[in-house]
UniProtKB/Swiss-Prot annotation:
It comes from Shigella boydii serotype 18 (strain CDC 3083-94 / BS512). Binds 1 zinc ion per subunit. This is 4-deoxy-L-threo-5-hexosulose-uronate ketol-isomerase. It is an enzyme of class 5 (isomerase). Zn(2+) binds at residues 192, 194, 199, 241. Its EC number is 5.3.1.17. It catalyses: 5-dehydro-4-deoxy-D-glucuronate = 3-deoxy-D-glycero-2,5-hexodiulosonate. Pathway: Glycan metabolism; pectin degradation; 2-dehydro-3-deoxy-D-gluconate from pectin: step 4/5. The lineage of its organism: Bacteria, Pseudomonadati, Pseudomonadota, Gammaproteobacteria, Enterobacterales. Keywords: Isomerase, Metal-binding, Zinc. NCBIfam families: PRK00924.1.
């Protein structure tokens, strides 16, 4: 488990490229036949990837010991989105078939979660939970899509809301998938911050010769991190989170905090950015 401490905005603005990477970048999300796990002190979110290829991968009691509990989800809820091929997720003996871009919400209290496939790649977010909501599969046909932006401003994109109150109940975790239209490069511009929650972006569906310049920092102290395919970046509440790519791309967003209202944002005008 890779533990990342919280960081003050005044400290963050003094960091060089490697310092920003150490604090915010999750460089390797997927490892064959393993799970990866980054634990952030910011709202206690856990992010990572699960990639069963030649054997099943389980997340259970061994993780619980690192969290001070008996098993991983004793006090947590889990959200996963599959960006690879078909696979299965077995939650306490109940098997769910998970296809490409299917998602699964696993409620607090599930003792054993087992992942199996030959070519799946499952990205996950995990957050503290105060009560148990039912485990539920969400398919792309069941999400709440919204198309925003314009080709003229190169930010035409479709936001697919998987885990939001309109689709299912969670304690605090929200997740979704945003896909840029061909030829569009910008996400979340004009940008915003979230005073009441943090966010993690996971960039994927990118060619090897492409990258995304992820914008972060306070609106008047912006910095950037160069993101490559299948990498994630942590965004504290005080930071903007936007990006521009060399080609169109897709990203999964996950939010944790005290408010699940999607539009609860502190907007920043482009003219006010520095």
């Amino acid at each position: 488990m890779d533990v990342r401490q919280s960081i003050h905005s005044a400290h963050a603005k003094t960091l060089d490229t490697q310092g920003l990477h150490n604090e915010f970048l999750v460089e390797k999300v997927f490892v064959a036949d393993e799970y990866t796990m980054v634990y952030s002190h910011i709202d206690r979110i856990i992010v990572g990837g699960i990639m069963p290829i030649t054997k099943t991968v389980s997340v259970g009691g061994e993780v619980g010991k690192q969290l001070g509990v008996s098993y991983f989800l004793e006090r947590r809820e889990l959200g996963v989105i599959n960006i690879g091929g078909a696979g299965t997720i077995t939650v306490d003996g109940q098997c769910y078939e998970i296809g490409h871009r299917d998602a699964l919400y696993v409620g607090k209290g599930a003792k054993e979660v087992v992942f199996a496939s030959i070519d799946t790649a499952i990205y996950y977010n995990c957050a503290p939970a105060h009560t148990t909501y039912p485990t539920k599969k969400v398919t792309p046909d069941e999400v709440s899509p919204v198309t925003l932006g314009d080709n003229l401003t190169s930010n035409r994109r479709t936001i697919n809301k998987y885990f939001v109150p309109d689709v299912l109940e969670t304690c605090q975790l929200s997740m979704g998938l945003t896909e840029l239209a061909p030829g569009n490069l910008w996400n979340t511009m004009p940008c915003h911050t979230h005073e009441r929650r943090m966010e993690v972006y996971f960039y994927f569906n990118m060619d090897d010769d492409a990258c995304v310049f992820h914008m972060m920092g306070q609106p008047q102290e912006t910095r950037h991190i160069v993101m490559h395919n299948e990498q994630a970046v942590i965004s504290p509440s005080w930071s903007i989170h936007s990006g521009v790519g060399t080609k169109a791309y897709t990203f999964i967003w996950g939010m944790v905090g005290e408010n699940q209202v999607f539009d609860d944002m502190d907007h920043v005008a482009v003219k006010d950015l520095r």
